[in-house]
């Protein structure tokens, strides 16, 4: 049978044309949502109630994406971004929205996701909020050596790219660390080994400022001397991390960063937590303290109670819970962090606290050390705790505090708890990352009587 050529619609023209859109809300990733020819259109950078000019960049069956070209009618929440690297650096993505607007959006998005995907409606509590700028106590900067210019660039990666955007300061990084970026860029370019340097990690700890330089080969004596001189001049602890993951202090002594909790709680003795660069630690010190305090308030640990802390890390929640008198069992999947947690417990003189390494997706309910659990705290990674909840149903703890860095997995896991007879009592936003779309939350569940 003969087949005749039929011209397809010129989709490239449709994609390249600039069009006007009315934005009515934000998605949970912070992109503006509009409607166009029966499709949802996602427009990063656009805000609710705005009329914008945008260019379609992607067409799918049920949705499309567009690039913001111009804001024709701005929202009352639109502000001028303060960072000169905004939109080139891949870090912040909501600086164009007021801080109050960001928090209102995040709180509403959290409630909406929980209601839509878990059918859960709890009593919303005030969001945990802090400083909007200079809040990060830790950051990892990427390096890129240009073989042509023989220069090393230091900065953050562009959004969805391996490209390094050179920066000389960062408005969300703790001020002392931000002030070190430009001097470090100059220093690293003076080293003979600059072509073999990896990332630079900066840490603002309670016992000083730290820098970790990833190296792929040993540095010569002159380079080591320059690093030691820089460290002394800037009053910073510098260590090198080699290919084996080992750390070496440039002055021959390795000092690890420390932060304290409960130091602002009346009548409580502070706990100190030491951590190794590279291991997970909450980057917002102010919000972390508030988050731990809220978890303690909700769980109200009492002497004689047994509390299970899953995904316990190096003891961020475990140590304060034990300090207030409960018997705490911490379980973590990363062996190095279990070792660090045990060292932290010993350093703080806590004998009512034990840590175990375990596969949290496996059934741990029959482990000889598990026993009866009165209360449970969960602080999983973005993937959530779905597998863990399958065996935790046997434990039937009276209360569950779930700390989440992903509202989607929180909603999915909440549905499991609700099916097991729990009721959502409290739900609140944790604004751990101002100027970004990231939503963290804490939820309290209680077993129905």
UniProtKB/Swiss-Prot annotation:
InterPro entries tied to this protein: 23S_rRNA_MeTrfase_RlmD (IPR001566), MeTrfase_TrmA_AS (IPR030390), MeTrfase_TrmA_CS (IPR030391), NA-bd_OB-fold (IPR012340), SAM-dependent_MTases_sf (IPR029063), TRAM_dom (IPR002792), U5_MeTrfase_fam (IPR010280)
Documented EC number(s): 2.1.1.190
Domain TRAM: 12-70
A Gene Ontology BP annotation from the UniProt entry: rRNA base methylation
Active site per UniProt: 405 (nucleophile)
PROSITE patterns hit by this protein: SAM_MT_RNA_M5U, TRAM, TRMA_1, TRMA_2
PANTHER family, alphabetized: 23S RRNA (URACIL(1939)-C(5))-METHYLTRANSFERASE RLMD, RNA M5U METHYLTRANSFERASE
Family membership noted in the UniProt record: Belongs to the class I-like SAM-binding methyltransferase superfamily. RNA M5U methyltransferase family. RlmD subfamily.
Designated name of the protein: 23S rRNA (uracil(1939)-C(5))-methyltransferase RlmD
Species: Shewanella sp. (strain MR-4)
Gene: rlmD
């Amino acid at each position: 049978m003969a087949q005749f050529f039929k011209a397809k619609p010129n989709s490239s023209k449709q994609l390249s044309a600039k069009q006007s859109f009315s934005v009515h809300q934000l998605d949970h990733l912070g992109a503006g949502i509009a409607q166009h020819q029966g499709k949802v259109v996602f427009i990063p950078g656009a805000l609710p109630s705005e009329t914008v000019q945008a260019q379609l960049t992607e067409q799918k069956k049920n949705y499309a994406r567009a690039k913001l070209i111009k804001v024709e009618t701005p929202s009352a929440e639109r502000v001028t971004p303060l960072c000169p690297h905004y939109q080139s650096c891949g870090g912040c993505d909501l600086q164009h929205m007021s801080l109050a607007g960001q928090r209102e959006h995040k709180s509403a998005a959290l409630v909406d996701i929980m209601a839509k995907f878990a059918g859960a409606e709890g009593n919303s509590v005030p969001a945990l909020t802090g400083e909007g700028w200079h809040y990060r106590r830790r950051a990892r900067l990427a390096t890129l050596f240009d073989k042509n210019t023989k220069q090393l660039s230091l900065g953050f990666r562009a959004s969805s790219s391996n490209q390094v955007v050179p920066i000389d300061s960062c408005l969300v990084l703790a001020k002392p660390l931000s002030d070190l970026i430009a001097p470090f860029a100059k220093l690293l370019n003076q080293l003979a080994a600059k072509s073999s340097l990896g990332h630079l990690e900066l840490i603002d700890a309670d016992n000083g400022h730290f820098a970790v330089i990833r190296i792929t080969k040993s540095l010569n004596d002159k380079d080591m001397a320059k690093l030691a001189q820089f460290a002394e001049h800037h009053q910073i602890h510098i260590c090198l991390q080699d290919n084996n993951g080992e750390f070496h202090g440039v002055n021959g002594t390795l000092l690890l960063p420390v932060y304290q909790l409960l130091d602002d709680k009346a009548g409580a003795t502070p706990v100190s937590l030491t951590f190794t660069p590279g291991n997970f630690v909450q980057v917002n010190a102010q919000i972390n303290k508030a988050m731990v305090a809220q978890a303690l308030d909700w769980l109200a640990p009492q002497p004689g109670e047994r509390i299970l802390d899953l995904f316990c890390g190096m003891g961020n929640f475990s140590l304060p819970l034990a300090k207030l008198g409960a018997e705490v069992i911490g379980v973590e999947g990363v062996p190095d962090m279990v070792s660090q947690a045990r060292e932290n417990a010993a350093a703080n003189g806590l004998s009512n606290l034990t840590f175990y390494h375990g596969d949290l997706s496996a059934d741990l309910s029959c482990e000889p050390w598990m026993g009866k659990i009165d209360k449970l705290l969960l602080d999983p990674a973005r993937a959530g705790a779905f597998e863990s909840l399958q065996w935790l149903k046997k434990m039937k703890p009276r209360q569950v505090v779930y700390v989440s860095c992903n509202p989607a997995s929180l909603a999915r896991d909440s549905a499991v708890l609700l099916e097991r007879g729990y009721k959502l009592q409290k739900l609140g936003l944790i604004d751990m990352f101002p100027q970004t779309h990231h939503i963290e939350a804490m939820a309290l569940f209680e077993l129905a009587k």
